[in-house]
Amino acid sequence: MTDANHLLDPSGALPQTRPPWTSRDSLRITRVRAIVTAPEGQPLVVVRVDTSDDGLYGLGCATFTQRYAAVAAAVDEHVGPLAVGRHPADIEDITRLIHYSSYWRSGPVLNNALSGLDQALWDIAGKRAGMPVYELLGGRSRSAVEVYSHAAGGTIEATLDQAEELLAEGYRNVRLQLGGPGLGTYGAPGTLGGYPRSPHPDGWAVEQYLRDAPRLFAAARERLGDSVNLMHDVHSRLTPKQAVVLARALEPYRLSFLEDVIAPELYDRLPEVRAASPVPIAVGEQIGSVPDAVRLVRDGGVDLLRLHTSAVGGLTPTRKIVALCELLGVRTAFHSPADVSPVGVAANLAVDISTPAFGYQESHTYNDATHEVFPGTRVVREGHLYPAEEPGWGIEIDERAAAKFPPVKFLHERWSSGVRRPDGGLEAP
Protein backbone atom coordinates (compact mmCIF):
# COMPACT_ATOMS: atom_id res chain seq x y z
CA MET A 1 0.00 0.00 0.00
CA THR A 2 1.42 3.39 -1.03
CA ASP A 3 1.90 5.93 1.72
CA ALA A 4 0.44 9.20 0.43
CA ASN A 5 1.07 11.23 3.57
CA HIS A 6 3.81 13.21 1.83
CA LEU A 7 1.12 14.66 -0.47
CA LEU A 8 -0.88 16.20 2.36
CA ASP A 9 -0.68 19.77 3.57
CA PRO A 10 -0.74 20.45 7.36
CA SER A 11 -4.55 20.66 7.33
CA GLY A 12 -4.79 17.10 6.01
CA ALA A 13 -6.05 18.18 2.58
CA LEU A 14 -4.64 17.09 -0.75
CA PRO A 15 -2.99 20.13 -2.36
CA GLN A 16 -5.17 20.07 -5.49
CA THR A 17 -8.30 20.56 -3.35
CA ARG A 18 -7.09 24.05 -2.43
CA PRO A 19 -6.78 26.66 -5.20
CA PRO A 20 -3.41 28.23 -6.01
CA TRP A 21 -4.92 31.71 -5.91
CA THR A 22 -5.63 34.03 -3.00
CA SER A 23 -9.24 34.97 -2.31
CA ARG A 24 -9.97 38.66 -1.98
CA ASP A 25 -11.56 38.21 1.45
CA SER A 26 -11.58 35.74 4.33
CA LEU A 27 -15.07 34.31 3.77
CA ARG A 28 -15.01 30.51 3.88
CA ILE A 29 -17.36 27.53 3.79
CA THR A 30 -17.47 26.13 7.31
CA ARG A 31 -20.02 23.34 7.12
CA VAL A 32 -21.95 21.32 4.53
CA ARG A 33 -24.73 18.95 5.56
CA ALA A 34 -27.77 17.16 4.19
CA ILE A 35 -31.23 17.69 5.65
CA VAL A 36 -33.87 15.06 4.84
CA THR A 37 -37.54 15.79 5.42
CA ALA A 38 -40.80 14.37 4.08
CA PRO A 39 -43.68 16.80 4.72
CA GLU A 40 -45.75 15.17 1.95
CA GLY A 41 -44.46 11.63 2.47
CA GLN A 42 -41.86 11.78 -0.28
CA PRO A 43 -38.32 12.29 1.06
CA LEU A 44 -36.78 15.61 0.06
CA VAL A 45 -33.03 16.16 0.42
CA VAL A 46 -31.78 19.71 0.90
CA VAL A 47 -28.16 20.72 1.44
CA ARG A 48 -27.27 23.56 3.79
CA VAL A 49 -23.92 25.31 3.37
CA ASP A 50 -22.80 27.53 6.25
CA THR A 51 -20.07 30.14 6.04
CA SER A 52 -17.71 32.00 8.34
CA ASP A 53 -19.99 35.05 8.02
CA ASP A 54 -22.50 34.43 10.79
CA GLY A 55 -25.99 34.11 9.32
CA LEU A 56 -24.84 33.76 5.71
CA TYR A 57 -25.81 30.33 4.41
CA GLY A 58 -27.22 28.75 1.29
CA LEU A 59 -29.69 25.99 0.42
CA GLY A 60 -29.65 23.59 -2.51
CA CYS A 61 -31.92 20.78 -3.69
CA ALA A 62 -30.38 17.29 -3.78
CA THR A 63 -33.59 15.29 -4.02
CA PHE A 64 -33.37 11.80 -5.49
CA THR A 65 -36.41 10.44 -3.70
CA GLN A 66 -35.88 6.76 -4.41
CA ARG A 67 -32.29 6.83 -3.06
CA TYR A 68 -32.45 9.69 -0.58
CA ALA A 69 -30.28 8.00 2.06
CA ALA A 70 -27.48 7.39 -0.44
CA VAL A 71 -27.55 11.04 -1.51
CA ALA A 72 -27.48 12.27 2.09
CA ALA A 73 -24.50 10.02 2.83
CA ALA A 74 -22.69 11.25 -0.28
CA VAL A 75 -23.19 14.86 0.83
CA ASP A 76 -22.01 14.29 4.38
CA GLU A 77 -19.15 11.87 3.69
CA HIS A 78 -17.77 12.94 0.32
CA VAL A 79 -19.04 16.23 -1.10
CA GLY A 80 -19.04 18.36 2.04
CA PRO A 81 -15.48 17.64 3.22
CA LEU A 82 -14.07 18.75 -0.15
CA ALA A 83 -15.89 22.07 0.04
CA VAL A 84 -15.17 23.08 3.64
CA GLY A 85 -12.47 25.73 3.78
CA ARG A 86 -13.10 26.98 0.25
CA HIS A 87 -14.38 30.42 -0.68
CA PRO A 88 -18.08 30.06 -1.62
CA ALA A 89 -17.63 32.24 -4.70
CA ASP A 90 -15.48 29.61 -6.42
CA ILE A 91 -18.52 27.66 -7.62
CA GLU A 92 -17.09 26.44 -10.92
CA ASP A 93 -13.80 25.22 -9.46
CA ILE A 94 -15.38 23.59 -6.40
CA THR A 95 -18.01 21.70 -8.36
CA ARG A 96 -15.54 20.54 -11.04
CA LEU A 97 -13.14 19.34 -8.36
CA ILE A 98 -15.83 17.33 -6.61
CA HIS A 99 -17.11 15.97 -9.92
CA TYR A 100 -13.61 14.73 -10.81
CA SER A 101 -12.78 13.48 -7.33
CA SER A 102 -14.89 10.32 -7.46
CA TYR A 103 -13.03 9.19 -10.61
CA TRP A 104 -16.15 7.27 -11.72
CA ARG A 105 -18.24 10.32 -12.34
CA SER A 106 -21.89 11.37 -12.63
CA GLY A 107 -24.93 9.25 -11.92
CA PRO A 108 -28.03 10.38 -10.03
CA VAL A 109 -26.65 9.84 -6.50
CA LEU A 110 -23.42 11.79 -6.89
CA ASN A 111 -24.96 14.42 -9.16
CA ASN A 112 -27.80 15.12 -6.74
CA ALA A 113 -25.31 15.43 -3.87
CA LEU A 114 -23.25 17.83 -5.97
CA SER A 115 -26.38 19.74 -6.98
CA GLY A 116 -27.23 20.42 -3.35
CA LEU A 117 -23.84 22.05 -2.85
CA ASP A 118 -23.91 23.86 -6.20
CA GLN A 119 -27.35 25.38 -5.71
CA ALA A 120 -26.48 26.38 -2.14
CA LEU A 121 -23.42 28.25 -3.40
CA TRP A 122 -25.57 30.12 -5.93
CA ASP A 123 -27.97 30.99 -3.10
CA ILE A 124 -25.02 32.42 -1.17
CA ALA A 125 -23.85 34.31 -4.25
CA GLY A 126 -27.23 35.96 -4.62
CA LYS A 127 -27.36 36.88 -0.94
CA ARG A 128 -23.86 38.39 -1.07
CA ALA A 129 -24.81 40.42 -4.14
CA GLY A 130 -28.18 41.43 -2.72
CA MET A 131 -29.84 40.02 -5.86
CA PRO A 132 -32.17 37.15 -6.76
CA VAL A 133 -30.25 34.43 -8.57
CA TYR A 134 -32.05 35.00 -11.87
CA GLU A 135 -30.42 38.44 -12.05
CA LEU A 136 -27.02 36.76 -11.78
CA LEU A 137 -28.00 34.71 -14.86
CA GLY A 138 -28.72 37.75 -17.01
CA GLY A 139 -32.04 38.97 -15.67
CA ARG A 140 -35.58 38.49 -16.90
CA SER A 141 -36.61 37.25 -20.32
CA ARG A 142 -40.29 37.19 -19.27
CA SER A 143 -42.58 38.47 -16.53
CA ALA A 144 -43.59 35.06 -15.17
CA VAL A 145 -43.26 31.36 -15.88
CA GLU A 146 -46.22 29.55 -17.43
CA VAL A 147 -46.76 26.19 -15.75
CA TYR A 148 -48.75 23.04 -16.33
CA SER A 149 -50.40 20.73 -13.84
CA HIS A 150 -51.72 17.16 -13.90
CA ALA A 151 -55.24 15.83 -14.27
CA ALA A 152 -55.51 12.09 -13.66
CA GLY A 153 -58.34 9.67 -13.04
CA GLY A 154 -59.43 6.09 -13.25
CA THR A 155 -61.91 7.01 -15.98
CA ILE A 156 -61.93 9.54 -18.80
CA GLU A 157 -64.71 11.45 -17.05
CA ALA A 158 -62.77 11.65 -13.78
CA THR A 159 -59.66 12.89 -15.57
CA LEU A 160 -61.59 15.60 -17.41
CA ASP A 161 -63.37 16.65 -14.20
CA GLN A 162 -59.94 17.38 -12.71
CA ALA A 163 -58.88 19.18 -15.86
CA GLU A 164 -61.88 21.49 -15.65
CA GLU A 165 -61.01 22.30 -12.04
CA LEU A 166 -57.50 23.30 -13.12
CA LEU A 167 -58.84 25.48 -15.93
CA ALA A 168 -61.10 27.22 -13.42
CA GLU A 169 -57.99 27.98 -11.32
CA GLY A 170 -56.35 29.74 -14.28
CA TYR A 171 -54.19 27.01 -15.80
CA ARG A 172 -53.92 26.96 -19.59
CA ASN A 173 -51.72 23.87 -19.74
CA VAL A 174 -52.86 20.47 -18.43
CA ARG A 175 -51.25 17.05 -18.64
CA LEU A 176 -53.86 14.29 -18.89
CA GLN A 177 -53.29 10.78 -17.51
CA LEU A 178 -55.64 7.82 -17.34
CA GLY A 179 -55.53 4.82 -15.04
CA GLY A 180 -56.47 1.44 -16.43
CA PRO A 181 -56.12 -2.31 -16.04
CA GLY A 182 -52.95 -3.04 -14.09
CA LEU A 183 -51.75 0.53 -13.75
CA GLY A 184 -52.84 3.53 -11.72
CA THR A 185 -51.64 7.08 -12.26
CA TYR A 186 -50.95 10.05 -9.97
CA GLY A 187 -53.31 9.08 -7.19
CA ALA A 188 -55.86 7.34 -9.42
CA PRO A 189 -55.90 3.57 -8.81
CA GLY A 190 -55.69 1.09 -11.62
CA THR A 191 -58.12 -1.79 -11.91
CA LEU A 192 -57.25 -5.34 -10.93
CA GLY A 193 -58.16 -8.51 -12.73
CA GLY A 194 -58.34 -6.96 -16.17
CA TYR A 195 -56.96 -10.08 -17.82
CA PRO A 196 -58.53 -13.01 -15.90
CA ARG A 197 -57.37 -15.68 -18.36
CA SER A 198 -53.74 -14.54 -18.38
CA PRO A 199 -50.85 -15.81 -16.20
CA HIS A 200 -50.85 -12.39 -14.49
CA PRO A 201 -54.50 -11.25 -14.36
CA ASP A 202 -53.56 -7.88 -12.82
CA GLY A 203 -51.20 -6.97 -15.64
CA TRP A 204 -50.94 -3.95 -17.94
CA ALA A 205 -51.19 -4.34 -21.72
CA VAL A 206 -49.61 -1.86 -24.10
CA GLU A 207 -52.24 -2.65 -26.75
CA GLN A 208 -55.03 -1.47 -24.45
CA TYR A 209 -53.06 1.65 -23.56
CA LEU A 210 -52.57 2.50 -27.24
CA ARG A 211 -56.36 2.31 -27.69
CA ASP A 212 -57.25 4.24 -24.54
CA ALA A 213 -54.91 7.24 -24.88
CA PRO A 214 -56.43 8.55 -28.15
CA ARG A 215 -59.93 8.10 -26.70
CA LEU A 216 -58.91 10.25 -23.72
CA PHE A 217 -57.71 13.09 -25.91
CA ALA A 218 -60.64 12.90 -28.31
CA ALA A 219 -62.97 13.33 -25.33
CA ALA A 220 -60.76 16.10 -23.93
CA ARG A 221 -60.94 18.21 -27.07
CA GLU A 222 -64.69 17.74 -27.27
CA ARG A 223 -65.26 18.69 -23.64
CA LEU A 224 -62.46 21.19 -22.92
CA GLY A 225 -62.27 22.89 -26.30
CA ASP A 226 -59.32 24.19 -28.27
CA SER A 227 -58.00 26.91 -25.94
CA VAL A 228 -56.31 24.55 -23.47
CA ASN A 229 -52.84 23.15 -24.16
CA LEU A 230 -52.76 19.39 -23.56
CA MET A 231 -49.83 17.11 -22.72
CA HIS A 232 -49.38 13.41 -21.96
CA ASP A 233 -46.72 11.31 -20.19
CA VAL A 234 -46.07 7.81 -21.56
CA HIS A 235 -43.62 6.95 -18.76
CA SER A 236 -41.14 5.20 -21.05
CA ARG A 237 -43.24 2.10 -21.72
CA LEU A 238 -43.22 2.02 -25.54
CA THR A 239 -40.91 0.76 -28.22
CA PRO A 240 -39.75 3.34 -30.77
CA LYS A 241 -42.29 2.09 -33.33
CA GLN A 242 -45.11 2.11 -30.78
CA ALA A 243 -44.17 5.67 -29.86
CA VAL A 244 -44.63 6.75 -33.47
CA VAL A 245 -47.95 4.90 -33.70
CA LEU A 246 -49.20 6.72 -30.59
CA ALA A 247 -47.96 10.11 -31.75
CA ARG A 248 -49.73 9.75 -35.09
CA ALA A 249 -52.93 8.62 -33.39
CA LEU A 250 -52.81 11.74 -31.20
CA GLU A 251 -52.07 14.16 -34.05
CA PRO A 252 -55.71 15.31 -34.49
CA TYR A 253 -55.82 16.47 -30.86
CA ARG A 254 -52.88 18.89 -31.16
CA LEU A 255 -50.88 17.99 -28.05
CA SER A 256 -48.25 20.46 -26.91
CA PHE A 257 -45.95 17.54 -26.19
CA LEU A 258 -45.73 13.80 -25.66
CA GLU A 259 -43.44 12.95 -22.77
CA ASP A 260 -40.95 10.14 -22.14
CA VAL A 261 -42.11 7.93 -24.99
CA ILE A 262 -39.27 5.39 -24.69
CA ALA A 263 -36.94 4.19 -21.94
CA PRO A 264 -33.55 5.88 -21.37
CA GLU A 265 -31.78 2.76 -22.58
CA LEU A 266 -33.27 3.46 -26.03
CA TYR A 267 -32.50 7.18 -26.27
CA ASP A 268 -30.27 6.63 -29.30
CA ARG A 269 -33.51 5.91 -31.18
CA LEU A 270 -35.13 9.23 -30.22
CA PRO A 271 -34.01 11.15 -33.34
CA GLU A 272 -35.90 8.71 -35.58
CA VAL A 273 -38.95 8.82 -33.28
CA ARG A 274 -38.97 12.61 -33.29
CA ALA A 275 -38.52 12.76 -37.06
CA ALA A 276 -41.59 10.55 -37.56
CA SER A 277 -43.74 12.14 -34.83
CA PRO A 278 -46.23 14.91 -35.63
CA VAL A 279 -46.36 15.70 -31.89
CA PRO A 280 -43.46 17.51 -30.12
CA ILE A 281 -41.34 15.09 -28.07
CA ALA A 282 -40.39 16.01 -24.47
CA VAL A 283 -37.74 13.87 -22.76
CA GLY A 284 -35.08 14.24 -20.10
CA GLU A 285 -36.19 13.74 -16.49
CA GLN A 286 -34.31 10.41 -16.28
CA ILE A 287 -31.04 11.82 -17.57
CA GLY A 288 -28.24 11.46 -15.01
CA SER A 289 -25.33 13.20 -16.72
CA VAL A 290 -24.46 16.28 -18.73
CA PRO A 291 -23.15 14.29 -21.74
CA ASP A 292 -26.48 12.45 -21.99
CA ALA A 293 -28.35 15.76 -22.02
CA VAL A 294 -26.00 17.17 -24.63
CA ARG A 295 -26.54 14.17 -26.90
CA LEU A 296 -30.32 14.53 -26.73
CA VAL A 297 -30.16 18.20 -27.69
CA ARG A 298 -27.32 17.99 -30.22
CA ASP A 299 -28.56 14.89 -32.05
CA GLY A 300 -32.13 16.06 -32.56
CA GLY A 301 -33.82 13.73 -30.10
CA VAL A 302 -36.09 16.25 -28.39
CA ASP A 303 -38.27 19.27 -28.97
CA LEU A 304 -38.45 20.03 -25.25
CA LEU A 305 -35.83 19.06 -22.65
CA ARG A 306 -37.31 17.92 -19.34
CA LEU A 307 -34.32 17.96 -17.01
CA HIS A 308 -34.54 16.97 -13.37
CA THR A 309 -31.93 19.66 -12.82
CA SER A 310 -30.44 18.21 -9.64
CA ALA A 311 -29.79 14.89 -11.42
CA VAL A 312 -27.30 16.57 -13.78
CA GLY A 313 -25.46 18.35 -10.96
CA GLY A 314 -27.32 21.57 -10.24
CA LEU A 315 -27.57 25.07 -11.64
CA THR A 316 -24.02 25.30 -12.98
CA PRO A 317 -24.34 22.46 -15.53
CA THR A 318 -28.01 23.22 -16.19
CA ARG A 319 -27.31 26.74 -17.41
CA LYS A 320 -24.70 25.35 -19.82
CA ILE A 321 -27.12 22.76 -21.19
CA VAL A 322 -29.79 25.43 -21.57
CA ALA A 323 -27.37 27.64 -23.49
CA LEU A 324 -27.03 24.77 -25.98
CA CYS A 325 -30.83 24.56 -26.16
CA GLU A 326 -30.94 28.26 -27.02
CA LEU A 327 -28.48 27.76 -29.88
CA LEU A 328 -30.21 24.69 -31.33
CA GLY A 329 -33.87 25.66 -30.99
CA VAL A 330 -34.81 23.25 -28.20
CA ARG A 331 -37.14 24.50 -25.48
CA THR A 332 -37.17 23.63 -21.78
CA ALA A 333 -39.90 21.93 -19.72
CA PHE A 334 -38.19 21.11 -16.43
CA HIS A 335 -39.32 18.22 -14.25
CA SER A 336 -40.85 19.50 -11.02
CA PRO A 337 -43.55 17.39 -9.32
CA ALA A 338 -43.67 16.55 -5.61
CA ASP A 339 -40.21 14.95 -5.69
CA VAL A 340 -38.54 18.32 -6.25
CA SER A 341 -38.15 20.47 -3.13
CA PRO A 342 -39.28 24.10 -3.05
CA VAL A 343 -35.57 25.00 -3.20
CA GLY A 344 -35.31 23.04 -6.45
CA VAL A 345 -38.37 24.85 -7.78
CA ALA A 346 -36.69 28.18 -7.04
CA ALA A 347 -33.61 27.06 -8.97
CA ASN A 348 -35.77 25.97 -11.91
CA LEU A 349 -37.53 29.33 -11.90
CA ALA A 350 -34.24 31.23 -12.00
CA VAL A 351 -33.40 29.48 -15.27
CA ASP A 352 -36.95 29.62 -16.64
CA ILE A 353 -37.32 33.34 -16.10
CA SER A 354 -33.96 34.18 -17.67
CA THR A 355 -33.64 31.92 -20.73
CA PRO A 356 -35.21 32.61 -24.12
CA ALA A 357 -35.39 28.81 -24.58
CA PHE A 358 -38.19 28.43 -22.00
CA GLY A 359 -41.16 26.32 -23.04
CA TYR A 360 -43.18 25.09 -20.05
CA GLN A 361 -42.63 24.39 -16.37
CA GLU A 362 -44.18 21.46 -14.53
CA SER A 363 -45.77 22.50 -11.23
CA HIS A 364 -46.95 21.00 -7.97
CA THR A 365 -49.21 22.46 -5.29
CA TYR A 366 -47.41 21.88 -1.99
CA ASN A 367 -49.33 21.14 1.19
CA ASP A 368 -49.34 23.33 4.30
CA ALA A 369 -46.66 21.23 5.99
CA THR A 370 -44.24 21.91 3.13
CA HIS A 371 -44.87 25.63 3.40
CA GLU A 372 -44.13 25.37 7.12
CA VAL A 373 -40.82 23.60 6.48
CA PHE A 374 -39.84 25.86 3.57
CA PRO A 375 -40.95 29.47 4.16
CA GLY A 376 -41.05 31.29 0.85
CA THR A 377 -42.30 28.29 -1.16
CA ARG A 378 -43.64 29.62 -4.45
CA VAL A 379 -47.38 29.46 -5.15
CA VAL A 380 -49.01 29.19 -8.60
CA ARG A 381 -51.13 32.23 -9.45
CA GLU A 382 -53.45 32.02 -12.45
CA GLY A 383 -51.35 29.32 -14.06
CA HIS A 384 -48.03 31.11 -13.53
CA LEU A 385 -45.12 31.02 -11.10
CA TYR A 386 -43.21 34.15 -10.15
CA PRO A 387 -39.66 34.02 -8.81
CA ALA A 388 -38.85 35.48 -5.43
CA GLU A 389 -37.36 38.97 -5.46
CA GLU A 390 -35.38 38.44 -2.26
CA PRO A 391 -31.62 37.83 -2.57
CA GLY A 392 -30.67 34.26 -3.43
CA TRP A 393 -33.51 31.79 -3.87
CA GLY A 394 -35.81 33.57 -1.45
CA ILE A 395 -36.45 30.20 0.26
CA GLU A 396 -35.62 29.36 3.87
CA ILE A 397 -35.82 26.15 5.88
CA ASP A 398 -37.28 25.72 9.36
CA GLU A 399 -35.27 22.79 10.69
CA ARG A 400 -37.53 22.32 13.70
CA ALA A 401 -40.46 21.91 11.34
CA ALA A 402 -38.41 19.68 9.02
CA ALA A 403 -37.64 17.35 11.93
CA LYS A 404 -41.38 16.79 12.46
CA PHE A 405 -41.56 15.00 9.11
CA PRO A 406 -38.80 12.39 9.03
CA PRO A 407 -38.66 10.03 6.07
CA VAL A 408 -40.21 6.63 6.59
CA LYS A 409 -40.03 3.49 4.48
CA PHE A 410 -40.86 4.92 1.11
CA LEU A 411 -43.32 3.12 -1.14
CA HIS A 412 -42.70 5.27 -4.20
CA GLU A 413 -40.48 2.45 -5.43
CA ARG A 414 -43.61 0.40 -6.11
CA TRP A 415 -44.31 2.32 -9.31
CA SER A 416 -40.71 3.12 -10.15
CA SER A 417 -39.85 -0.59 -10.13
CA GLY A 418 -41.99 -1.04 -13.25
CA VAL A 419 -45.24 -2.72 -14.19
CA ARG A 420 -45.95 -6.26 -15.37
CA ARG A 421 -47.66 -7.36 -18.54
CA PRO A 422 -50.48 -9.94 -18.51
CA ASP A 423 -47.87 -12.60 -19.31
CA GLY A 424 -45.89 -11.56 -16.21
CA GLY A 425 -43.04 -9.83 -18.02
CA LEU A 426 -41.66 -6.59 -16.60
CA GLU A 427 -42.12 -3.22 -18.34
CA ALA A 428 -40.33 0.04 -17.57
CA PRO A 429 -41.94 2.34 -14.97
Curated annotation (Swiss-Prot):
Region (Disordered): 1-22
Keyword Metal-binding (UniProt): yes
GO BP terms, alphabetized: amino acid catabolic process
GO terms assigned for molecular function: magnesium ion binding
Keyword Cytoplasm: no
InterPro entries: DgoD-like, Enolase-like_C_sf, Enolase-like_N, Enolase_C-like, Mandel_Rmase/mucon_lact_enz_CS, Mandelate_racemase_C, Mandelate_racemase_N_dom
Positions that bind Mg(2+): D233, E259, E285
Residues reported in the UniProt entry to bind D-arabinonate: H235, E285, R306, H335, E362
Gene3D superfamilies: Enolase-like C-terminal domain, Enolase-like, N-terminal domain
Keywords assigned by UniProt, alphabetized: Magnesium, Metal-binding
Highest rank taxon of the organism: Bacteria
Family: Belongs to the mandelate racemase/muconate lactonizing enzyme family. GalD subfamily.
Function: Has no detectable activity with D-mannonate and with a panel of 70 other acid sugars (in vitro), in spite of the conservation of the residues that are expected to be important for catalytic activity and cofactor binding. May have evolved a divergent function.
Name of this protein: D-galactonate dehydratase family member Caci_4410
Native source organism of the sequence: Catenulispora acidiphila (strain DSM 44928 / JCM 14897 / NBRC 102108 / NRRL B-24433 / ID139908)
